[in-house]
């Protein structure tokens, strides 16, 4: 999440956790590391300064609560202050009227049309019927893109490439989808200086009378997001914001903090290219993952999406206990294929930095290869991986059409991951990190 920012902050917290003595010098060193990471992520310097000041004052003057060590207390302070930086609370999209009308706004290239497809998918999974109206008369491919991004989702699309009147398209789409639970209106990409387009946006808003106007902001623009959000806010009443492209953006932290600074609620974030890579934005969960503390609640929710609830609990236990067999690992691989990129899934585990480096680089191709290899194993081998020696490795490789080295690689990955995850068990999570994780796991 957020590329280098997540790695830098997680590394800083890991370094702090390993300190034997925590004094004023250590506190200032930690703050410098945090400052460096945030500035590199394009967070506004004034915000970084205020955050640093708050952390320093609390770390040097507050007494740790009973049973909490000084370094655990500092980690907790960093967590608290960074959550405040991003707005503290989450804002859910509440569909409380029908048809619930959502007007989508955003600059061209912000990922607006893609995000409409993702939100339509999100709403369909919640059981709502969805209609999407294309009022973008500026881009010839706008309607086709909407159809492409909503394909197979049972979402109705309305648009007319011959009609150049965006207001007429909005009126007709509104009339057509009156029986839908939710109507989403796609609009032309706007530039904050294009007065004609901003005026059209105001006119569209008057016709649609949206329950909510959602502004889509490209996370790669960093703190420029502040000015963009303010420009749109002057033209219409923005209900919420979605920040996209946070899966690898170097400036994502700057975009998130800039938007939060002006008080605009961030409801969702885009975390990848897949249709399911849209997450409800929760500052507490988000910061927990950035600091390497994991997000077991989100992980459990993802698991529950692809399995029965009872299996979800067992799967989480298997991941954390380190007792799972190759059979369990096969189930995990199958589920991870549905849950999203492995790097995102792993970031939800507390202490994910302890996992083997290759774990975060696992590709879908590698997972498919490993599944084929495991399909060539006997029931006994899946249950007792330790019995797989030279002759069995050769047989499994021949049966799966892979090399001996591939089978050995799988077994090595299994052993190392099992050992690493064993250290992440629920009983071993103490201090504020443990309290947070146990709260997430309720």
Curated annotation (Swiss-Prot):
It is found in: Cytoplasm. PROSITE patterns: SRP54. InterPro entries: AAA+_ATPase, P-loop_NTPase, Signal_recog_part_SRP54_M_sf, Signal_recog_particl_SRP54_hlx, Signal_recog_particle_SRP54_M, SRP/SRP_N, SRP54, SRP54_GTPase_dom. The keyword RNA-binding applies. Its EC number is 3.6.5.4. GO terms for biological process: SRP-dependent cotranslational protein targeting to membrane. It catalyses: GTP + H2O = GDP + phosphate + H(+). Keywords: Cytoplasm, GTP-binding, Hydrolase, Nucleotide-binding, Ribonucleoprotein, RNA-binding, Signal recognition particle. GTP binds at residues 106-113, 186-190, 244-247. GO terms for cellular component: signal recognition particle. It comes from the Archaea. One of its GO terms (molecular function) is GTP binding. Involved in targeting and insertion of nascent membrane proteins into the cytoplasmic membrane. Binds to the hydrophobic signal sequence of the ribosome-nascent chain (RNC) as it emerges from the ribosomes. The SRP-RNC complex is then targeted to the cytoplasmic membrane where it interacts with the SRP receptor FtsY. Part of the signal recognition particle protein translocation system, which is composed of SRP and FtsY. Archaeal SRP consists of a 7S RNA molecule of 300 nucleotides and two protein subunits: SRP54 and SRP19. Composed of three domains: the N-terminal N domain, which is responsible for interactions with the ribosome, the central G domain, which binds GTP, and the C-terminal M domain, which binds the RNA and the signal sequence of the RNC. Belongs to the GTP-binding SRP family. SRP54 subfamily. This is Signal recognition particle 54 kDa protein. It comes from Methanothermobacter thermautotrophicus (strain ATCC 29096 / DSM 1053 / JCM 10044 / NBRC 100330 / Delta H).
